Amino acid sequence: YAWIGILKTEGLLNLALISIGIIDKPLTIMNTDLAVYIGIVYSYLPFMILPLYANLEKMDMSLLEAAADLGCRPLKTFWTVTIPLSLPGILAGCFLVFIPVMGEFVIPDLLGGTNTLMIGKVLWTEFFYNRDWPVASAVAIILLALLVVPIMFYQKSQEKAIS
């Protein structure tokens, strides 16, 4: 609910932007896709950061020192050492974010208004407002497929990596 007060036309963001002279008239941010993106990123960013941080904290720093000793520049070290070693944390964070965001309906409903279409919101609308249970069931199966297929590919890749 706080984001509504921040993003509305008379909200804190518009007042701040007008007071420092960046804009002349208030922006319409509420009931747009941008408002939904802001709300979702704000809500789910910790679910991405925590597994990534845990993975990076376990990383052996001597590998970064070895890359630097061998003449590797910091950016190349980042792409060739840090990113490959942090892939498990990146994948865990992606799954921790992807799964709940696919079913999200509160944030799109509050910040995006009626024009925002996300699969969780469509599912909620079809079940509870339109009472169109066949369409809602089809949407639920699509959502299930969208969630299960990446998890199956991840499991297959983990099984190949182990063997």
Where are the model-predicted features located?
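Residues that define the loop-to-transmembrane-helix transition and helix capping
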Residues: 33-34, 64, 75, 87, ...
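Hydrophobic/aromatic positions within or immediately flanking transmembrane alpha-helices
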Residues: 36-37, 51, 78, 137
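Transmembrane alpha-helices
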Residues: 42, 47-61, 72-103
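Membrane-interfacial helix termini and adjacent extracytoplasmic/periplasmic loops
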Residues: 1-41, 75, 111-115
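Membrane-embedded alpha-helical segments of multi-pass transporters/permeases
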Residues: 48, 109, 148-152
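C-terminal transmembrane helix and the adjacent membrane-cytosol boundary/short C-terminal tail
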Residues: 53-68, 135-163
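Generic alpha-helical transmembrane segments of integral inner-membrane proteins
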Residues: 41, 94, 98, 102, ...
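Glycine-rich helix-loop "coupling/hinge" segments at transmembrane-helix boundaries
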Residues: 7, 105-131
